[in-house]
Every structure is written in C-alpha cells, then in structure tokens.
C-alpha cells in the first residue's frame, strides 16, 4: 500500500492529492536550497542545470529525469522509471502528486518566481513514462484545459 492509498482511505481521494501536492511543494522549496538559489543557477547553462537536476533525483532513488524536446510555451520533463508511479495499479488518473508539487516548489525556489507543474503522462495509468509539463501558471492552466477537453498532448502543446 502507498501513502496515497492510506491518505485516500482516511481523507478521500481529492484531499489526498491536495495533501501530497502541498507537502511535495514545501519539500521542493526546501530542496531548492541544494541548488544554491537563483544566483548559482543563473550562472549555469541549461544543459548543466538539467544534468544537475537529473543527478539530484537519481542519487536519491527517484529515477531518471530529463528534459524532453525544446521548450516552447511550456517545458517537459520525462522519466521512464519514476519511483512514485506504480505501473501495476492501472489508475485512471495521473498519480505522482507529491512529485508534481515537489518539482513546482523546487523550480519556484531556483527560478525566484512561480513555476506551475502538471503531470501529463503517468506510468500508473498505463503511459510508457511519467511526464511533467512546467511553465507559467497561465500556460499550464491552458494546457490542462485542453487536456481535460480531450485534446491529445502533442496537439495541446502545439496550440500553446
């Protein structure tokens, strides 16, 4: 059983998602100090930052995480082996709520401003990988709306 399962039993599925996302966000803000804040990150190339971020997660057993494609309105991070996902459960929804919050908190911390994150692919629901879109709150909100309306991910990203 997972922490999400136990929280869902006690508080309900939506409350569990919110609690995990919030806890992840706070943990991510704290973890952002590992990167030395905006001054240190500002001096890194994009390639160096993404390598550092990927190494941060893999050293801690979270799995591999790397940018996917060229960022336009939103960026994408992907992992074929993300630890929060459980491909055996067949969840109809994306389930990496803690990770989504953590990534948002960490990116907000290092960017020095708001960065929204949305899980757009999840191994727990049968996708080949976990994918996290990140960007401005407006861009992520627009992406979410398109996905809810049934637009596939590639088309939704192209429309932004």
Cite the ranges covered by each PLM segment.
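Active-site helix/loop of acyl-thioester processing domains in fatty-acid/polyketide metabolism
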Residues: 96-112
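N-terminal accessory segment detector
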Residues: 1-75, 81-98, 115-116, 121-160
